[in-house]
Amino acid sequence: MDTLGWSCKGKQMKLLSTLCLFLILMVEEVSCSMRLHKLSEFHAKLQQRVAYSPKEDLAMPGPNGAKKGGRVFYPVGYGGDPAGTRESSEAILSALSDAFQVQSKQQMLPGVSDLGGVVIDLQGGTYLVSKPIRLPASGGGNVVIEGGTLLASETFPSDRHLVELWSPNSPGANDQSTSYPKMVENVGIYYEDITFRDILLDSSFRGGGIYVVDSARIRITDCFFLHFTTEGILVKRGHETLISGCFLGQHSTVGGDPGERNFTGTAIDLQSNDNAITDVVIFSAAVGIVLRGQANMVTGVHCYNKATFFGGIGILVKLAGLSQTRLDNCYMDYTGIIMEDPVQVHVTNGFFLGDASIVLKSINGQVSGLNVVNNMFAGDPQHMNPIVALDGQFPNVNQVVVDSNNANGMSLRSTVGKLTVKGNGTKWVADFSSILLFPNQINHFQYSFYSQGETEFLKHAVTNVSNNVVVVESETAVNAIVSVVVDQYSTPGEVI
């Protein structure tokens, strides 16, 4: 019985060992299978990365030099020369024409077809163009044009722009001058969500860079504009054109150019509303930025386009009486800001170097809702130029604050003044004429009278406020300290 029991137990042990070995082999096989599956997935992803490698795209636009791959169109496939030796205008225009025919049933703004994010890929090439690259007149939206150089040929028309967005339905769109109405009125939108990215536009001293008319939500990002004679970027009507991370200059320079006094052209001209210019450098042009519309925002811009001494203007705010503009955190490098009858304009957190300043130019003599605060100014102490100056008379001034700025080598100007006058006598004169911005305008004043060594109350009063001078007099002679605070702030309708 014992022998039989041991025999049964032995068989059970062998069976159990065999079963365990089988299970171990099965687990290893499953684990191996999972590893192979993951390896296969990784290999597939790697092949996909290789298939869409930028180097592969640069080597060949598509299989056998195809014109497109998916929804990406290649001007090289249309006969464009990426080496920049042969004329490529027609190739790029053909690629654009085909891209604008890839339309979905979706619309963006009314009448603007959604093109589904089609891309015109310049593939890092340099393309010589003899005529403007004008987007199809049919209009459209959701398009990207990226990655290359457009170079104007010797025969490029000097009154046109390298890239143009305008429809024949836009009134006056073919007039690319900078004439403008008093009010910007939109008549229709034909292009929307068009993105220009990583493009160098070299106008070869013939015409301008990009011309945009009656378009909405256009992005010009990380682009370089060079050798323009009219405008680097000109926008008419429409709204919400975003210009960011761009460099613009008529001449290649990093400052101190011997030919600076001869710089011409305008880097950015916006005859449009609700636009933003962000993180942009303007290194050579007669005028850096012209703002002719309302509700525009300029922030983080460095202007050293042409020194004020040579007649240059950094930022020109036009549309007198309707400006509604914000200029924030800008670096005005030897070139300043001119504002025509500014209304609701905000200039803050800026740095003005090399006697760069702010000039208020009178058109109808109005300034309202102007804030110039928290800026730094640096200039030549031998000149001591004012940080803010007036060009003309301003009889209509209200809600203006120029304060909390600091200056080194320049004269502070403010709409708020504080002075302390000491003296032994009957009259104390606080002269604010070298401090206050507007002449002969003190809207509010306060004063305190401290008589030293006197125990009795003395009669004293303000006897005159004129020509930005406050006079305080006492009934009897006394050794006193008089502190006076004034401001030029008034609200509409306030009687002074």
Short names for language-model regions:
Residues 2-141, 146, 150-197, 253-256, ...:
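Extracellular "leader-to-stem" segments immediately downstream of a signal peptide or signal-anchor
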Residues 4, 105-106, 335, 354-355, ...:
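Short loop/beta submotifs within extracellular cysteine-rich repeat domains
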Residues 47-65, 360-369, 373-413:
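Small/polar residue-rich beta-strand/coil "junction" motifs that cap repeat-based extracellular fibers
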Residues 92, 97, 130-135, 156-187, ...:
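Extracellular beta-strand/beta-solenoid scaffold signature
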Residues 142-149, 190-203, 216-227, 239-257, ...:
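Right-handed parallel beta-helix
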Residues 319-321, 331, 341-343, 353, ...:
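A structural signal for short secondary-structure junctions
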Residues 345, 352, 360, 365-370, ...:
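Structured C-terminal portions of repeat-based eukaryotic scaffold domains
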